[in-house]
Amino acid sequence: MDKKLKVIVSGGGTGGHIFPAISIADAIKAAKPNSEILFVGAEGRMEMTRVPAAGYDIIGLPICGFDRKNPFKNIVVLFKLMRSQIKAKKIIRKFKPDVVVGVGGYASGPTLRMAGKLGI
């Protein structure tokens, strides 16, 4: 029997990121039915409803984009980025993926950075 493939798919924000991510997950499941897939997205964004509707688990990061109109609000963004990196690292350590795939969107950055730092 094949070893269970564990995959994190990270990203979202728009349908242009989410639906290709779900297609990637579906293709992995078709090729390796016993694989385990976990999505990592941005809290409060579209992926938090679309991914579970497609049958996959998702964990949200407290990440958001920069505010171009009010640069002072970006101080909060930096703290959210740090918190997101810490949370992404914890998710990766707990899930122990074989591979991490980024599809774009706010959540991809911290997740891929931490995966790289952890040697994945």
Regions found by a protein language model. Give the residues of each.
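Short helix-capping segments at alpha-helix termini
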Residues: 29-34, 117-119
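Short amphipathic alpha-helix
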Residues: 17-28
